[in-house]
Amino acid sequence: MFPMVTEFMNYGQQTVRAARYIGQGFMITLSHANRLPVTIQYPYEKLITSERFRGRIHFEFDKCIACEVCVRVCPIDLPVVDWKLETDIRKKRLLNYSIDFGICIFCGNCVEYCPTNCLSMTEEYELSTYDRHELNYNQIALGRLPMSIIDDYTIRTILNLPEIKT
């Protein structure tokens, strides 16, 4: 055939293919128009976190036996445990316990391997501050339980989490 005719046929096939791809993209766009919005109005609406959410660590001072398992399993050796050996009872007495949440990666190893369950993860995720030194929590700050999102009447909670399709 003539080269001009074959180029014209290729041009026609490419035009049809391009129109099909544009149509497929347009159909996907139209299918998303029926869905609910994914974003929420953050300060006024909050999602209720899942049961296994890894938020700020809660620490119970009375349960801790200063075994330092949390320090050994932490990938960045983060918890600082100060203790004193009581010679009369031959046990360690915990003096100070602190975690710097500016460095913590929230892996949950300390909570998982703690033999006395004195560490637990909370649903608190709003840890932002203007000074990074405020992220270093001692045992008093770690012992405070966060206010539950459900109990706050000024915040509308969003219960329906988007389902992940696999």
Swiss-Prot record:
**Keywords assigned:** 4Fe-4S, Chloroplast, Iron, Iron-sulfur, Membrane, Metal-binding, NAD, NADP, Plastid, Plastoquinone, Quinone, Repeat, Thylakoid, Translocase
Its membrane topology, per UniProt? Peripheral membrane protein
Explain how, and how many, cofactor molecules are bound: Binds 2 [4Fe-4S] clusters per subunit.
Q: What is its EC number?
A: 7.1.1.-
**Essential cofactor(s):** [4Fe-4S] cluster
4Fe-4S ferredoxin-type domain location is 55-84, 95-124
For this UniProt entry, what is the primary localization, expressed as one broad class? Answer: plastid
Q: Which NCBIfam families match?
A: ndhI, NuoI, PRK05888.1-3
Subunit structure comment from the entry: NDH is composed of at least 16 different subunits, 5 of which are encoded in the nucleus.
Protein name as catalogued: NAD(P)H-quinone oxidoreductase subunit I, chloroplastic
State the organism named in the record: Zinnia juniperifolia
